[in-house]
């Protein structure tokens, strides 16, 4: 027992009232659920450490994604976002945990739940929300919308189920060709795990030992179909056959971080691809047009929110371990709320690209050329090469 603790004990024994003192921790160890392994002799550590700085950052990052997605859901209901919109609420620990393990030069490619990843890899909250509403301030000036955002080393959302799987292998091939010590994190859902291109991509990746992590974010439902009804084998981490795999608790950010670190080291050592399955859950329907309650009950969703929510669980951990106080986390919540609210103002008021921008951003570094129009007889001369050129022409660089 420390001298400080003995003194407190002595004072209490003497009948003197003492006030509880909580000393802030700087680093704490936690235990995570063991990973399930496929064709591997060992896996990630179950004893992990977390320092105060990282704890506050991870909490803030997950809260930004949660609040940003909530804002997007409201914008869709107000018909300020049109078309498709798939939300990531409930799965925040997957993205933030993986990002925490990535290093400079690592790449990510995913499907249509891409808003959080776009922000994590460099876009601002304003750029994400403004892209969703089709505004100039958007990540790609409003041209991409919900499913087609990108930033440096983020190869986007992809609107076709499973289309990103072979593309991720291609990014990894480029990394190996350039002799980069990096990996491409290729994400897909349990619904896309049955797509033929995944098996083609894993075959080529293993054949050439490409540094690619094939990550299945198993949220239990492919649209409205349960994994058990769509897959003969629901152990997605084993589906690579000759590609080793690990199963991870995707609701635990620390388990995700440690597993991704381990997986990245595996790929960096030249052993080739690895499959990861993140067991997670989405709170909303498949998309905003799906209420998400025809194939599951509201009670099921509430039970997950109550017992497995990634943000609440992490919050409880860092408070009870004295890495942060409840007041500090409330201050972060307030700061995040303000950031998202400010972004919403721009996302709902900024202008849109003029019609001339429709034909920009088609070809890279080429002179103006004729582009086929809506009919075979219609041709249009490309007046601007990029949207930036269009904005410059109207005085908005």
UniProtKB/Swiss-Prot annotation:
Recorded E.C. number(s)? 1.2.4.1
The record's listing under InterPro entries reads: DH_E1 (IPR001017), PDH_E1_Alpha_Subunit (IPR050642), Pyrv_DH_E1_asu_subgrp-y (IPR017597), THDP-binding (IPR029061)
Cofactor(s) named in the record: thiamine diphosphate; Mg(2+)
**Residues reported in the UniProt entry to bind pyruvate:** 86, 112-113, 159, 161, 190-192, 219
Q: How is its activity regulated?
A: E1 activity is regulated by phosphorylation (inactivation) and dephosphorylation (activation) of the alpha subunit.
Highest taxon of source: Eukaryota
- Reaction catalysis annotation: N(6)-[(R)-lipoyl]-L-lysyl-[protein] + pyruvate + H(+) = N(6)-[(R)-S(8)-acetyldihydrolipoyl]-L-lysyl-[protein] + CO2
Residues the record lists as binding Mg(2+): 190, 219
Where is thiamine diphosphate annotated to bind? Answer: 112-113, 159, 161, 190-192, 219, 286
Does Oxidoreductase appear among the keywords?
yes
- CDD domains, per the entry: TPP_E1_PDC_ADC_BCADC
Please give one Pfam family short name. E1_dh
Q: Which GO terms describe its cellular component?
A: mitochondrial matrix; mitochondrion
MF terms in GO: metal ion binding; pyruvate dehydrogenase (acetyl-transferring) activity
Query: Where does the record place it?
Result: Mitochondrion matrix
Return the broad EC class.
oxidoreductase
Gene Ontology biological process = pyruvate decarboxylation to acetyl-CoA
Keywords, ordered alphabetically: Magnesium, Metal-binding, Mitochondrion, Oxidoreductase, Phosphoprotein, Pyruvate, Thiamine pyrophosphate, Transit peptide
Q: Is Transit peptide one of the keywords UniProt gives this record? A: yes
State its role. Answer: The pyruvate dehydrogenase complex catalyzes the overall conversion of pyruvate to acetyl-CoA and CO(2). It contains multiple copies of three enzymatic components: pyruvate dehydrogenase (E1), dihydrolipoamide acetyltransferase (E2) and lipoamide dehydrogenase (E3).
Name this protein carries in UniProt: Probable pyruvate dehydrogenase E1 component subunit alpha, mitochondrial
The gene is pdha-1
